A protein has these predicted regions:
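Acceptor-substrate binding/catalytic loop of class I
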Residues: 146-163
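A SAM-dependent methyltransferase catalytic signature shared across enzymes that methylate proteins
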Residues: 162-178
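Conserved beta-strand signature within the Rossmann-like core of class I S-adenosyl-L-methionine
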Residues: 133-146
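A short SAM/SAH-binding and catalytic strip from SAM-dependent methyltransferases
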Residues: 108-121
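Short catalytic/ligand-binding loop motif for oxyanion handling, primarily in non-cytosolic enzymes
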Residues: 68-71, 88, 119, 144-148, ...
Length: 202
């Protein structure tokens, strides 16, 4: 008799949803509308990301969710949340998968914590941001370490670490720091950086 665990069933449903999303280049509003979709376990990733943000920076966080990053930022930082839906607190509502991306107000730093996996055209997004920010701090579950069940997780793209570095470089950004959160990589990119200073990784 065929049986399926709840976890496996949920993964299968998510895989189907992701496949449909990929076919239409749309965001999964149903999933991300609810705050229940944002795990508190992700706060430790936000803490690492915050450590890569320079003090006194104007920061915009895409996929802000519970906005845990806001209280983790270094001294003097201002914070603008952005997400698919209005989370309050001055949220810039923005769907990163829309055909026409909106103008992004100037900020020093853009943050993507567990977001790029859900973007259908990552190169287009980074290119769009290239004149709006000086630094991008982004996590990504690279295929080097995360090959299994990507669609079951809702991820719509499959990029290796070298893919990530190449697409950011094509948009005029150079990596100057890399850290890790579990099997995910966390990168800091600076626009038109000529030299790569030392960075202490965890």
């Amino acid at each position: 008799m065929f049986s399926m665990t709840k976890e496996r069933a949920e993964s299968l449903i998510q895989s189907i949803t992701t496949s449909l999303s990929t076919a239409t280049n749309r965001s999964d509003y149903q999933r991300w509308r609810s705050q229940d979709s944002f795990s508190k376990d992700w706060d430790s990733r936000s803490s690492i990301i915050a450590s890569l943000v320079p003090p006194d920076s104007a920061v915009i966080e895409f996929g802000a969710g519970r906005m845990a990053l806001k209280d983790l930022l270094p001294r003097g930082c201002s914070y603008t949340p952005s997400d698919l839906v209005d989370r309050g607190g001055g949220t810039l509502v923005c769907d990163l998968n829309r055909k026409m991306l909106p103008p992004i107000p100037r900020h020093d730093v853009a943050v993507f914590g567990g977001v790029l996996e859900y973007v259908h055209d990552v190169p287009r997004l980074i290119s769009h941001l290239s004149n709006s920010v000086e630094i991008i701090v982004a996590s990504y579950a690279v295929t080097d370490f995360n090959q299994e069940n990507r669609r079951g997780n809702g991820w719509v793209n499959d990029l290796s670490s070298s893919d990530i570095l190449a697409l950011f470089e094509a948009a005029g950004f150079r990596m100057d720091c890399e850290d890790h959160w579990g099997t995910q990589s966390i990168y800091r990119f600076r626009r038109q950086l000529q030299h790569r200073p030392e960075c202490r990784s965890r």
